[in-house]
């Protein structure tokens, strides 16, 4: 196994030095900040992560403003009330990524988020209160309650939100059968 210092040295050289490497490191948000983020933002980030799976992030990010408009700025109650006709129309919208299962997952996830909001007051409060030493359990909770958040999507979503988490390599996932 390669020593961490060797890996770190390679990374510093690759990105242009210590400062460049430091600027790329993830800085988790404190729990108080997570609790203050609106539920609409969590729903947006969750579904952006879902659409990024299997596609280039640049493609998804370029189209995301159209998603914000199409999904009413990801207002949880509004999206949860979308009917199948609304979603079928969106699945044909050329401004969006026309992936029917993922389009329908947005509504499913809004409904799941409503349940968490009803139980804990907000999705952010739920994330903020989750014990740091139970990270994998949080991944499993997200995978169970939400649609299209399997594999590395749950930890990637948490990382995008600023929740402290780690990411498993494909090697680890294949050998541990966690997901």
Question: What are these language model-derived features?
Answer:
Residues 1-96, 103:
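N-terminal polyanion-binding entry modules of DNA glycosylases/AP lyases
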Residues 139-147, 157-179:
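Phosphate-backbone recognition surface of nucleic-acid-processing proteins
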Residues 153:
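PRPP/pyrophosphate-binding module of the type I phosphoribosyltransferase fold
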Residues 72-145:
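Alpha-helical ds-nucleic-acid-binding substructure associated with the helix-hairpin-helix region
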């Amino acid at each position: 196994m390669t020593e961490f210092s060797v890996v770190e040295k390679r990374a510093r050289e690759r990105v242009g030095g210590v400062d460049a490497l430091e600027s790329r490191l993830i800085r988790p948000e404190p729990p108080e900040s997570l609790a203050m983020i609106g539920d609409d933002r969590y729903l947006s980030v969750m579904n952006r992560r879902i659409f990024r799976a299997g596609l280039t992030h640049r493609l998804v990010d370029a189209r995301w403003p159209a998603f914000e408009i199409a999904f009413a700025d990801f207002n949880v109650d509004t999206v949860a009330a979308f009917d199948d006709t609304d979603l079928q129309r969106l699945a044909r919208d050329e401004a969006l990524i026309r992936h029917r299962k993922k389009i329908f997952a947005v509504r499913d996830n809004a409904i799941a988020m409503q349940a968490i909001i009803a139980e804990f007051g907000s999705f952010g409060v739920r994330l903020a209160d989750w014990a740091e030493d139970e990270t994998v359990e949080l991944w499993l909770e997200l995978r169970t309650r939400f649609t299209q958040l399997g594999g590395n999507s749950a930890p990637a979503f948490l990382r995008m939100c600023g929740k402290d988490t780690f990411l498993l390599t494909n090697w680890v996932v294949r050998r541990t059968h966690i997901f």
